[in-house]
């Protein structure tokens, strides 16, 4: 017997998707603080920075926009941790693809910050998992971070 595909809806707690999702940033994020730093890939930062600025207005202070360093590595995370604007933020906004988002997630864990992900490509699951994958600077696998 052949079964037709069924439509199933899954709701992830803390997951917002859709054309108006940026309009919900303030409501979703302000319970976690008033200052956010944005970490991401250079192209992703260029694509999303103005949209994030408009969405948060004066409700969330953006302490800075910083490239993640091109590799989700412990070395890049240590470098980001040394930036005063990162240390002063209450939250981390991780913008981009998988490695940029993983960098933001592990940075948040290392600095005891809440993070929010803003995927700019559809092919990454990094935005909806707690797993972060770290690499050595040469791109070889280093470890998984949970």
PLM segments and residue spans:
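Fold-independent oxyanion-binding glycine-rich loops
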Residues: 19-20, 41-42, 95-97, 118-121, ...
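Short C-terminal domain-edge/linker segments immediately following a structured domain
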Residues: 67-71, 95-97, 124, 145-146
